[in-house]
């Protein structure tokens, strides 16, 4: 058994390579180190930009990645207790300080506005008094038959009468005959109130009263006896038809003196007045 052991030792010694036979590639292989040790050994390389001077890292300001922290509620209370400022003082400090000159100018502007308002109120009061007077006169004299004479004596009463008749839609042959001349004259008026009232009156007359007027004008008187009322109605109706024909005849002249809105309203009225032009 000892002989066998000796033989195995000899064969093992023969197969064993000497230390000099280690390949050179292993010797020339670079000695590797850990990443952390290499990172520590590297030096800080300064960054150079084109057109700017070299700066060392120490010269640059240090920035931190930490976000700005909001102050706590307790800290804000402490700060308020240290510097107590009342709300009234803050409000007074924020308001601009007014100089005496600016206060004088504000007072003068307020006074001018107040005087303008007073003047307008006085004008409204004068108009209201005139309207109330016209209404009283109309109520006292509306049942009389001589309305033409009343309107001819008091020209300011005609607009009030026309507005009342428009609101009540109570136009008749007598009121049409009394107001039609005033309506024709004020269709082209610069006063918007008069112009609109006259247009509304003419539209109301042509809508509800035109056929009645044509009928009164075409009635024939009796051969035996005299009907005074029928003759008066026929005469008034004939005069109204004559005035209607004047409006149709002077259409182009009227159009040159009114605006577009009034032209649209007058077109509808003239369309209804075609019946008058065909009537003999």
UniProtKB/Swiss-Prot annotation:
Residues 72-92 have a biased composition (Basic and acidic residues). The keyword Calcium does not apply. The keyword Cell cycle applies. GO terms for cellular component: condensed nuclear chromosome; cytoplasm; katanin complex; male pronucleus; microtubule; spindle pole. Keywords: Cell cycle, Cell division, Cytoplasm, Cytoskeleton, Meiosis, Microtubule. Forms a heterodimeric complex in conjunction with mei-1 which severs microtubules in vitro in an ATP-dependent manner. This activity may promote rapid reorganization of cellular microtubule arrays. May act to target mei-1 within the cell. Required specifically for meiotic spindle formation in the female germline. This is Meiotic spindle formation protein 2. It comes from Caenorhabditis elegans. The lineage of its organism: Eukaryota, Metazoa, Ecdysozoa, Nematoda, Chromadorea. The gene is mei-2.
